[in-house]
Amino acid sequence: MHTVKLLCVVFSCLCAIGWASHHSHRQPCHSPQLTSGTMKVVSTGGHDLASGEFSYDSKTNKFRFVEDTTHANKTSYMDVLIHFEEGVLYEIDSKNESCKKETLQFRKHLMEIPVDATHESESYMGSPSLTEQGLRVRVWNGKFPELHAHYSLSTTSCGCLTVSGSYYGEKKDLFFSFFGVETEVDDLQVFAPPAYCEGVSFEEAPDDHSFFDLFHD
C-alpha cells in the first residue's frame, strides 16, 4: 500500500523551492494518475449529504463513488461511475442489477484543478515546526460560469492531492473533504460499467447537468 503521508518529508527540498516561488504565477498542478480514499460531502448548513469510497483515474478522467451504506439512514445509496471525457454518468444499482445512463455536458469537477484556476495562497494547516503535526497546502480559486458558481480547492503542496473543496452555486453550497488518500486503486475494474449497463439507452440531461447535482438534501 502506498499510503500518502500528509507531511512532506521526502520532498522537503522541492517543497522549499516551491514555497519560495511567486505564488500568483503558479500554474495548476496535476494529481497523481490514480487516487482512492474516503470522500465526505456536506452542505454549508452542516447537513451530511454523502460519505463513501472514491476512486479516480486522472489520466482517463474517470471517477467512481460508492456511498457507505452504514453512514446514514437512507432508503437508497449512491453508486456512480463518471467518464468525464466522454460525458457519461452511470447510476448503478448492484443489488437489483440495474443501471441508469445520463449525458453529462458539464465535465469539470473537484478531483482535478481546472486549468484556469487561480492560485490564491500557500499555508500550513497545523504546526509547521512540529514533526508530522502540520500539512502545507495550496489554495486555488475559480469560477464555473456555465453553472453560475465558483469554487475553492485545497491541495497538498507536495503531490497535489486534493484535501478539501468548496462549491458555491445559485441553488446549493457544498463542502468536500478527502481522507485516507492513497496513490493507487486496488481494482481498476471499478472504472468499467457493469455488464448489465450495456445496451441501456441514454437519458438526456440539461446542458448544466453536472457532478455537483449528485449531492442534495
Swiss-Prot record:
Post-translational modification: Binds calcium through the terminal sialic acids.
InterPro entries membership: Ependymin (IPR001299), Ependymin_CS (IPR018224)
Residues glycosylated per entry: 73, 96
Keyword Hydrolase attached: no
Entry's localization field: Secreted
One annotated GO biological process: cell-matrix adhesion
Subunit structure: Forms disulfide-linked dimers.
Job description of the protein: May play a role in neural plasticity. May be involved during axon regeneration.
PANTHER family recorded: EPENDYMIN-RELATED, MAMMALIAN EPENDYMIN-RELATED PROTEIN 1
Protein name, UniProt field: Ependymin
Organism per entry: Danio rerio
Lineage, opening ranks: Eukaryota, Metazoa, Chordata, Craniata, Vertebrata
Gene field: epd
